[in-house]
Amino acid sequence: MIEPEAVLGLLDYEITTIERHGGGIRISARYSGPISCPHCHGTRLRSKGRYVRRVRQESIGRRACLLELEGHKWRCLACRRQFRQRFPGILPCQRASEAFQRMIFGQHLDGINRSRLGKREGIGAATVERYFQRGLQRQFSEWHSRRCPLILGIDEHFFTRRKGYATTLCDLRNHRVYDVVLGRSELSLESYLQRLEGKSAVRLVCMDLASVYRSVVRKHFPNARIVADRFHVIRIVNHHFLNCWRELDPVESRNRGLLSLMRRHRHNLKPEQQARLAAYLAEFPGLDLIYRFKQRLCYLLLKKHRTRKQCQLLAVRFLKAIHQLRQAGLPQLVSLGETLHSWRNEIAAMWRFTRSNGITEGFHNKMELINRQAYGFHNFENYRMRVKLLCG
């Protein structure tokens, strides 16, 4: 005996016939469950005739499946309204069951383009897109919470040349993308952040040294502590140091071997590399002092898991280093000192809180892969929904 639920994936259906139809299968069935009025939910009904509804059903193997459902036209004796019978698993005014739409959604999500999938299943490319959009909306309502996460990561990434950059909001606690917003200026983010729920519950926000994002967080997340991303802080220290080196020695600063040695932390150098670097720095005593200062500053910034009392001692050393940079007299070092002074509170929070934006940067790599697989996105909302589904 054929189990209707095993074939159709739907409850309370009775299969009357299964026959070959062209190159596919045609299944005739009827609904045997309870029927009620969709207007008043009354059960006192009078039949006004029969009709047959034909919809596409999920394919069986590689053969397309057509589902023919025998239904009734009913008149409710309570509210005196007439209606056609509704079938569970098939939405009103739809030519395909929910199971078939989920199948199209899954195949399109796996990378089959709309035109090829439409030709294979005998539907239009626009219909494939419509089923896909419905599937995305259904997944969002099931998976994504509207409230803002407690630990948030904010960073920017490039979208298109015409529309520019987009801002990524990442849930650092649960390792998923919370949302993607077009734009990176305070004006473009204003309307979105005003509608955001649960902003007062956010406790920590991690970001790079972007003044725009800092002002946005201070305005819209009043209870959040801002923590600078360690990678970006050390990168900006190296950036100013290398620019200062180019001003002091324009010739040797182009040497890729020396450039690699200058950029690394001292503990990552092999003994022969340390000897080569020491021989070069011996020729420039002033550059040697700057290099040693940079190494001490980087080691100071690399510290983590510190107590409150330990952070107070580190803060004294950090403020002293900032003062020395601002009094150095070299433009690149003075600029670095001003930047660190402007971000001193957010940088000091790195010693106490170990959260970083590495998770967000990793999702940016995945988002770039999504963009390449789709050969680019013109519609930002399509891109946003695809990212939230695959990275959320």
Residue ranges, per PLM feature:
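Short alpha-helix plus adjacent loop in nuclease-associated cores
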Residues: 233-252
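Acidic/histidine-rich catalytic cores and adjacent linkers
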Residues: 30, 34, 39, 46, ...
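Short, conserved DNA-binding cores of transcription-related domains
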Residues: 1-81, 87
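Gly-rich Lys/Arg/Thr-decorated short loops/hinges at beta-loop-alpha junctions or inter-strand turns
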Residues: 87, 170-176
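The DNA-recognition helices of helix-turn-helix-type DNA-binding domains
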Residues: 124, 135-139, 244, 354, ...
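Short, positively charged, Gly/Tyr-enriched micro-motifs
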Residues: 54-163, 199-202, 347-348
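Active-site beta-loop-alpha junctions of metal-dependent nucleic acid enzymes
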Residues: 95-96, 177-198, 204
